[in-house]
Amino acid sequence: MALSTFGAIMGYAAEIIKQTEEAYQGLISKAKNSTLKQALQDLAGEEKKNQSLMERTRRENVTEMILEPITGLHQEEYIVDLKGVPQKDDTDLVKVAMILEERVKRFFSDASAKVPLPEVARTFRKVSQKREENLGKLQGLRLHQPLK
């Protein structure tokens, strides 16, 4: 489905954040390593804050919505199917978390370039940049700490 209006983009932004938070909750229950568990709890907490941020951003910018159609964003490009991704051990869980972070980073980066409202674009860029930081932290967990 094309995300061709400000409302559709904000709705999908809220949805993708909610899905990611729910996925993190599932990963937390599977994590064995306490450092990984804490990292996943931090990421889930961040998602709750991002949900509030998206609601506030939508509310504050609704009067400035530009009715000009937005092109080039499609929901299908940001769908990830985690059913086929192994989740047997902590290393697998880190990989899943990285897939989730990459997905959200890509969406917010792409959306920031398409949204015609500077305030919203700036918010989206910040969310995308934070995802890049999160990926670095997860990469560090996966490479430099024993996870079992």
What are these regions (language model features)?
Residues 31-34, 38, 54-57, 61, ...:
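Hydrophobic stripe of amphipathic alpha-helices that form coiled-coil interfaces
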Residues 56-90:
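Carboxylate-rich helix-loop segments that flank metal/cofactor sites and access channels
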Residues 6, 32, 36, 90-93, ...:
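Residue-level recognition of alpha-helical structural elements
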Residues 2-4:
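N-terminal leader/targeting segments
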Residues 104-148:
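Preference for long, well-ordered alpha-helical segments
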Residues 13, 20-27, 78-116:
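Acidic/histidine-rich alpha-helical segments that form the ligand environment
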Residues 10-24, 40-58, 101-104, 124-138:
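Alpha-helical transition-metal enzyme core signature, strongest for iron centers
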